[in-house]
Amino acid sequence: MELVMKDAKSALEVSETTFGREFNEALVHQVVVAYAAGARQGTRAQLTRSEVSGGGKKPWRQKGTGRARAGSIRSPIWRSGGVTFAAKPQDHSQKVNKKMYRGAIRSILSELVRQERLIVVEKFGIEAPKTKELIAKLKEMELTDVLIVTAEVDENLFLAARNLYKVDVRDVAGIDPVSLIAFDKVLMTADAVKQIEEMLA
């Protein structure tokens, strides 16, 4: 299959297995959920009654005071007591094997092509790390909400886009399922497309 390049009259020959797949919604959902879960810190921590300091001595005797019996001032029903079902640090990551991950990326790329949300250009860059310059270039292409994917890390593009809302710059190694579906359009250089094909082959 061929992808028409926006800044050139020629078309780029690409693999059907990478850019012409049927959309597998269940697989994409599973991989995106797993990816987002893996990004969670899971560092919350509360103290149970055994972990709160103090509470070793019985506050008053068992019988004869007329008060409710109490064994510790750190009981969860007491002020400053422990938490009944205390939250503990947790690993939220889910296992996703390579085949599934690559399959999801292929599925997303194919759907982007079908929805005409993938734009391929011969080259894309700016001369200096100026946000104004990047905005002008994107305006020219009528792009506002876009992920820019280059073959190598482009320092000028990265610095220029750093302060822009709804614009992100990644190299091929930095793309993931979440970033590919988070933006309205995905702008890729021809070299990046070839590199992705090699990576997913």
UniProtKB/Swiss-Prot annotation:
Keyword RNA-binding appears in the UniProt entry: yes
UniProt xrefs under InterPro entries: Ribosomal_uL4, Ribosomal_uL4-like, Ribosomal_uL4_dom_sf
Positions in coiled-coil regions: none
Family annotation (Pfam families): Ribosomal_L4 (PF00573)
Region of interest: Disordered: 45-66
Single GO molecular function: rRNA binding
Any single Gene Ontology cellular-component annotation: ribosome
Gene Ontology biological process terms, A to Z: translation
Presence of the UniProt keyword Ribosomal protein in the record: yes
Keyword annotations from UniProtKB, A to Z: Ribonucleoprotein, Ribosomal protein, RNA-binding, rRNA-binding
Subunit organization: Part of the 50S ribosomal subunit.
Similarity section: Belongs to the universal ribosomal protein uL4 family.
Purpose of the protein: One of the primary rRNA binding proteins, this protein initially binds near the 5'-end of the 23S rRNA. It is important during the early stages of 50S assembly. It makes multiple contacts with different domains of the 23S rRNA in the assembled 50S subunit and ribosome. Forms part of the polypeptide exit tunnel.
PANTHER family per the UniProt record, alphabetical: 50S RIBOSOMAL PROTEIN L4, LARGE RIBOSOMAL SUBUNIT PROTEIN UL4M
Name of the protein: Large ribosomal subunit protein uL4
